[in-house]
A protein has these predicted regions:
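Sec-dependent N-terminal signal peptides of Gram-positive bacterial secreted proteins and lipoproteins
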Residues: 1-4
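Solvent-exposed, well-ordered loop and adjacent helix/strand elements within mature globular domains
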Residues: 7-11, 17-205
Length: 205
């Protein structure tokens, strides 16, 4: 009887140790399973090329809503100050963007631009500007031009004769670009008209 009494506690401790080890393994397995499941559910982000997209051709001229005259589009790309964009989704997009070395606001390695309502885009939407020389400028919509400031097709800002305004940080913008108000001065290859705007069905979140 004394021997049996001595063996009982040892057996009980052994069982407790085994149960603890099994529980620990179960927790580890459960954790791994949950992590893997989340990874599968989230999945890798699909390439931009796989998103639906709409292409808009840009004409070489437009009619001024003020004078009624036909104005040629020479390819100008003006600038807009980011600090003045503080409203709604556009304000949020500008608040999380940062200027590059020339003072151009960028987000996700894309330039913030303001465009007219013709393109049916919203702040944060991905788009490409295709230039006449084949250069592609990767952009994200950072602001919407007011219809009152654009032509009847809501493509061009009739006062500046441009279809794309690059959003800049006026504290760090390159001096020559700021003084002339011409974003095309950033790169020699940008000095060409925009002939097409491609809007992707993807919005920065």
């Amino acid at each position: 009887m004394p021997v049996e009494a001595a063996d009982a506690p040892i057996t009980e401790e052994t069982k407790t140790f085994e149960n603890t080890a099994m529980l620990s393994e179960l927790v580890e397995c459960t954790t791994v399973t949950i992590v893997e499941e989340c990874a599968v559910l989230a999945g890798p982000e699909k390439p931009l090329e796989e998103y639906e997209k709409t292409a808009y051709d840009i004409p070489s001229s437009f009619v001024s809503p003020v004078s009624g005259k036909t104005i040629s589009y020479k390819g100008g790309k003006t600038i807009e100050r980011s600090r003045k964009i503080t409203y709604g989704k556009a304000g949020y997009i500008n608040s999380i963007a940062s200027p590059d070395s020339d003072g151009f606001m960028k987000l996700d390695d894309r330039y913030l631009v303001a465009v007219g309502s013709r393109f049916n885009a919203q702040p944060g939407q991905y788009m490409d500007l295709i230039l006449q020389n084949g250069v592609v400028i990767k952009c994200i919509m950072g602001d919407l031009k007011a219809d009152i400031d654009t032509d009847t097709t809501n493509t061009f800002t009739y006062r500046s004769c441009c279809c794309s305004e690059f959003i800049i940080d006026d504290k760090t913008i390159r001096k020559d670009i700021y003084e002339r108000g011409n974003a095309s001065l950033k790169y020699f290859s940008w000095d060409a008209p925009v002939v097409r705007v491609v809007v992707y069905d993807k919005v920065y979140c």
